[in-house]
């Protein structure tokens, strides 16, 4: 049963963090589309590792957006504490998730093989 609770907490944090990034943060450096792909909260609720995909063709823009997200982690943590009632408000650690880009690359390779 604790695994089920952990999954619910992860999904709730994922939904709220996505909402905060899309609607609450007013940082002009956030120019690309950002998607929260996964959230892993530790069992003691001290840390939340947030995996994000940043959709941009420019590598420099991705870095700027990721830096802006990292600098907004305190603000996101504060808003999460107001919205979600848990014992400890977790420290947010952002991780860049390139699995979507990798999947698109693999799909392109498969298409090239099919075309030959």
From Swiss-Prot:
An example of a GO molecular function for this protein is:
ribosomal small subunit binding
Q: Does the keyword Cytoplasm apply?
A: yes
GO cellular component labels: cytosol
Give an example GO biological process.
Answer: maturation of SSU-rRNA
Q: Which UniProt keywords apply?
A: Cytoplasm, Ribosome biogenesis
Presence of keyword Iron-sulfur: no
Name the Pfam families for this protein.
RBFA (PF02033)
- Chief location: cytoplasm
Q: Which residues cross the membrane?
A: none
InterPro entries from the xrefs? KH_dom-like_a/b, RbfA, RbfA_dom_sf
Protein location:
Cytoplasm
Q: Which NCBIfam families match?
A: rbfA
Relate the protein's function as given in its record.
Answer: One of several proteins that assist in the late maturation steps of the functional core of the 30S ribosomal subunit. Associates with free 30S ribosomal subunits (but not with 30S subunits that are part of 70S ribosomes or polysomes). Required for efficient processing of 16S rRNA. May interact with the 5'-terminal helix region of 16S rRNA.
Subunit composition? Monomer. Binds 30S ribosomal subunits, but not 50S ribosomal subunits or 70S ribosomes.
Q: Which family does it belong to?
A: Belongs to the RbfA family.
Name the record gives this protein: Ribosome-binding factor A
Organism taxonomic ancestry:
Bacteria, Bacillati, Bacillota, Clostridia, Eubacteriales
């Amino acid at each position: 049963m604790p695994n089920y609770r952990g999954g619910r907490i992860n999904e709730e944090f994922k939904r709220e963090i996505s909402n905060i990034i899309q609607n609450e943060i007013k940082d002009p450096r956030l120019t690309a589309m950002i998607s929260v792909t996964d959230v892993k909260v530790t069992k003691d609720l001290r840390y939340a590792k947030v995996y994000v995909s940043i959709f941009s063709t420019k590598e420099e823009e991705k870095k700027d957006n990721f830096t802006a997200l990292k600098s907004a982690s305190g603000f996101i943590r504060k808003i999460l504490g107001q919205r979600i009632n848990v014992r400890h408000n977790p420290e947010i650690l952002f991780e860049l998730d390139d699995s979507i880009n990798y999947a698109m690359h693999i799909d392109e390779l498969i298409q090239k093989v099919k075309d030959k």
